[in-house]
């Protein structure tokens, strides 16, 4: 068990600025003369699902900076974070086919996830909705979902995310900007670039309209900075 915002009593600790007034243990204060607060156990997340896009379009960019490489690093970081919180994590990769690693906890699961990520290749064009439809029966209602994808060349993204949100899932979309990654290797006329950026922004805005938290991940932004926006999960 770990401390957090749950219901079950975990331990007493010293009062810190910002602690809720109602969490003060007045009996402990009467005995010790020191302000102490009740710390509760964190309610465990049932499962965390990470969907990583490994389609052919994920190769856009340089050898080291492309949606697949950026996405693989992000998936490893997110899974490690939740496994260290003692949550269970599932990994789904989709490109030419879907690969599913069922949710588990612990270091062994972390190793399995890293092994699967090390083997990914950019190929295929499997749509996201086909993947989420196949996975839906295996996902408990309300499970947090991370979708790591450039979102390019897939018209099913919007309905897939709408369906996930409709089933109570907290959805985070971490999207490497393939338009900006492409600029690293080829010259895009300014007008064309601006049109493509506007189309992408409209797509991201539409996704956020379904309640998803959307991160437009630029090539020059470190993963840690991008993930600052999802700490509330």
What kind of feature is each model-predicted range?
Residues 133-145, 151-233:
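Von Willebrand factor type A / integrin I
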Residues 101-115, 228-233:
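Short, electropositive alpha-helical surface patch
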């Amino acid at each position: 068990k770990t401390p957090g915002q749950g219901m079950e009593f975990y331990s007493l600790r010293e009062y810190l600025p910002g602690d809720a007034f109602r969490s003060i243990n007045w009996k402990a204060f009467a005995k010790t003369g020191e302000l102490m607060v009740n710390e509760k156990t964190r309610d465990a997340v049932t499962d965390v699902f990470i969907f990583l896009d490994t389609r052919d379009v994920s190769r856009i960019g340089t050898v080291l900076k492309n949606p697949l490489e950026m996405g693989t690093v992000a998936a490893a970081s997110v899974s490690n974070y939740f496994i260290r919180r003692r949550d269970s994590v599932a990994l789904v990769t989709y490109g030419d086919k879907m690969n599913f690693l069922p949710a588990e906890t612990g270091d062994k699961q972390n190793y399995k996830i890293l092994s699967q990520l090390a083997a990914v290749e950019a190929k295929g064009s499997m749509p996201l909705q086909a993947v989420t439809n196949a996975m839906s029966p295996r996902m408990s209602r309300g499970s947090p979902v991370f979708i790591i994808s450039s979102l390019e060349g897939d018209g099913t993204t919007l309905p897939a995310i709408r369906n996930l949100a409709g089933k109570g899932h907290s959805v985070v979309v971490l999207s490497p900007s393939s338009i900006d990654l492409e600029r690293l290797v080829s010259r895009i006329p300014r007008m064309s670039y601006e049109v493509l950026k506007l189309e992408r922004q409209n797509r991201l805005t539409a996704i956020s309209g379904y309640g998803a938290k959307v991160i437009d991940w630029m090539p020059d932004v470190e993963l840690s900075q991008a993930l600052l926006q999802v700490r509330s999960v």
